[in-house]
């Protein structure tokens, strides 16, 4: 019997085709996974870019409507004044010759109040506001009326805390407050060419502390545009003394004079005094504070002695 010759082992029919199908399938599987990873990288990059943009946006407190910065935080201004036409708001009130605005405008100076004085008076605000504070982002302390934000309401701190006030504030605190008020009053009188003796402190004059906490009541919504003469009536000249620094202590929170086509903004700086006539010629608002805490004091003056208030005293 002749020996049988064995050939090479037979490969099952269709096995190479199966391998080709598996290889093709593997490639097909790999492609979606690679595409997925590519898209994930793109999405991650996009999210990262958006986050960085938001952080940068927040850090500088950009406002689309602001066209010009008239006083930057880093500047030390001896005095800058911009004259604007007076509105008709003053015509609806009793006029006082030599005082009621006939020259209108806005000014900024960094040499009237020192940074040391600003730090000292800020400590007065911090002591008073430590007794309460709004549930929302804006708290006020009025040493004249005693109004203090507490939760969603206001209390009279002199009645509420009674004799304990003597342990919180000092005579030196109130003397500093009076000295600063007088310096600001003289600055306004000189800028507008009127006699300081014709100006009377008026209400409300108050400390403000603003942070990024969500508003809880209408009193916390400080960012709406308004006209002081319309809102308060008694105001003829408004001033703000800033007690903290933009972009160091807080972001956002710049002061914006609203003008058609070209808004003007003031960047707060501790010791900076911003002042202006209170009519519609100086429609304004404050940007929302995005982070940190912004301190300031609003000091308002009237030409009407009937609307005047006395300096606060520690009794």
UniProtKB/Swiss-Prot annotation:
The gene is Ogfod3. This is 2-oxoglutarate and iron-dependent oxygenase domain-containing protein 3. Residues 18-31 have a biased composition (Basic and acidic residues). The lineage of its organism: Eukaryota, Metazoa, Chordata, Craniata, Vertebrata. GO terms for molecular function: dioxygenase activity; iron ion binding; L-ascorbic acid binding; oxidoreductase activity, acting on paired donors, with incorporation or reduction of molecular oxygen. One of its GO terms (cellular component) is membrane. Keywords: Dioxygenase, Glycoprotein, Iron, Membrane, Metal-binding, Oxidoreductase, Signal-anchor, Transmembrane, Transmembrane helix, Vitamin C. Its cofactor is Fe(2+); L-ascorbate. Residues 63-315 are lumenal.
């Amino acid at each position: 019997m002749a020996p049988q010759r064995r050939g090479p082992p037979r490969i099952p029919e269709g096995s190479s085709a199966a391998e080709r199908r598996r290889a093709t399938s593997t490639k097909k599987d790999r492609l979606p996974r690679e595409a997925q990873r590519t898209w994930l990288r793109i999405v991650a990059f996009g999210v990262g870019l958006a986050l960085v943009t938001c952080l940068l946006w927040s850090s500088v407190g950009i406002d689309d409507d602001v066209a010009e910065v008239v006083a930057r935080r880093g500047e030390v201004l001896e005095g800058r004044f911009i004259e604007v036409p007076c509105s008709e708001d003053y015509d609806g009130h009793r006029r006082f010759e030599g005082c009621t605005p006939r020259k209108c405008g806005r000014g900024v100076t960094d040499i009237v109040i020192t940074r040391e004085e600003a730090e000292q008076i800020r400590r007065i605000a911090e002591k008073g506001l430590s007794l309460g504070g709004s549930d929302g982002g804006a708290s006020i302390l009025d040493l004249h009326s005693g109004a203090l934000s507490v939760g969603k309401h206001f209390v009279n701190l002199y009645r509420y805390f009674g004799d304990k006030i003597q342990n919180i504030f000092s005579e030196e605190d109130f003397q500093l407050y009076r000295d600063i008020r007088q310096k600001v009053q003289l600055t306004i009188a000189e800028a507008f060419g009127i006699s300081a003796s014709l100006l009377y402190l008026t209400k409300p004059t108050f400390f403000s502390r603003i942070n990024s906490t969500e508003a809880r009541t209408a009193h916390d919504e400080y960012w709406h545009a308004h006209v002081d003469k319309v809102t308060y009536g008694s105001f003829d000249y408004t001033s703000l003394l800033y007690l903290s620094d933009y972009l160091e202590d807080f972001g956002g929170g710049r002061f914006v004079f609203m003008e058609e086509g070209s808004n003007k903004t003031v960047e707060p700086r501790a010791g900076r005094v911003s002042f202006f006539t209170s009519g519609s010629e100086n429609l304004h608002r404050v940007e929302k504070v995005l982070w940190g805490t912004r301190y300031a004091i609003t000091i308002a003056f009237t030409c009407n002695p009937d609307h005047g208030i006395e300096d606060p005293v520690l009794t």
